[in-house]
């Protein structure tokens, strides 16, 4: 609450101009977004959001961090798409067409989150868990995940795989990779194999564009062509891999999705 007040004061924003406070959390919420049911990375269960926001004197909205990033990425993408339209009528026809604009967002962070947006709407599922791609099994009886299960996508492609588990930072890992350190090359090849396996699974299931964001993504951009080639090899039908891309939003822009 004090941090919120400090930010508002520092930027000379009047209280009446504050629309609200958005809070992003890496966890699963209930259907009303009033309780954080489970956050594996934070080790929290059934935490009432009201406890988090009670001292903040503004309207608050808490949401899953990956969904917030996905929202921001979607609107950022649409903003530039709309710049190519000739007039308002073109935009209205596009919005009213009902044509699918399916987009899956995968966030590579300390954990691995996901979100699915179709026809400008975030798909939430029956239990508000749609998009928990990080807990899709890619190696049965494999590595232990923070959720307590084994073989999860997250256990193989989170930032920890390339940093904490290698006793280095992401910067140091990719520096060693550029220096052709054999150990780091082996880890990275395994990482890309697991990453493309998961992305291919998502594409097979949902047949929509897949966007990868989060702290790890910027380090992977130089390998985009290699990743697409691997995706082409793994896909059962015809594709050139162009359905895959990296997020365009910066971390600061992504915050607007909350």
Residue ranges and their predicted role:
Residues 1-15, 155, 163-222, 242-254:
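Adenine-nucleotide phosphate-binding core of ATP-dependent small-molecule kinases
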Residues 1-11, 17-21, 27-104, 221-234:
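Glycine-rich phosphate-binding loop and adjoining helix at the ATP-binding site
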Residues 24, 139, 213:
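Conserved residues at the C-terminal ends of beta-strands
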Residues 231-245:
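Charged, glycine-enriched surface loops/patches
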Residues 17-19, 108-110, 240:
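Short, basic and Ser/Thr-rich N-terminal targeting/leader segments
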Residues 1, 54, 61-63, 72, ...:
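Glycine/GP-enriched mid-protein hinge/lid loop-to-helix segment characteristic of carbohydrate kinases
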Residues 26-29, 109-111, 216-217:
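Short glycine-rich anion-binding loops that position phosphate/pyrophosphate groups of nucleotides
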């Amino acid at each position: 609450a004090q941090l919120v007040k400090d930010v508002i004061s520092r930027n000379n924003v009047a209280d009446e101009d504050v629309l609200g406070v958005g809070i992003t959390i890496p966890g699963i919420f209930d259907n009303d977004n009033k309780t954080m049911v489970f956050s594996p990375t934070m080790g929290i269960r059934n935490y009432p959001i009201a406890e988090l926001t009670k001292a903040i004197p503004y309207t608050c909205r808490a949401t899953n961090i990956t969904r917030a990033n996905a929202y921001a990425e979607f609107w950022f993408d649409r903003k530039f798409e709309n710049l190519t339209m000739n007039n308002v009528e073109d935009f209205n026809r596009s919005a009213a067409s009902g044509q699918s604009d399916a987009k899956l967002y995968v966030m590579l962070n300390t954990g691995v989150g996901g979100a699915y947006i179709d026809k400008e709407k975030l798909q939430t599922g029956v239990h508000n868990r749609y998009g928990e791609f990080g807990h899709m099994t890619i190696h049965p009886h494999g590595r232990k995940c923070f959720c307590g299960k084994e073989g999860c996508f997250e256990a193989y492609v989170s930032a920890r795989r390339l940093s904490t588990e290698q006793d280095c930072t992401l910067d140091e890992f990719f520096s060693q990779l550029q220096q052709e350190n054999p150990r780091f090359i082996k880890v990275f090849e395994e990482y890309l194999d697991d990453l493309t396996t998961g992305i291919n699974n998502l594409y097979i299931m949902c047949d929509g564009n897949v966007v990868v964001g989060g702290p790890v993504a910027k380090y992977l951009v130089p390998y985009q062509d290699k990743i697409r080639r691997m995706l082409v090899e793994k896909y059962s039908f015809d594709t050139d891999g162009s359905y895959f891309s990296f997020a365009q939003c910066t971390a600061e822009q992504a915050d607007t999705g909350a």
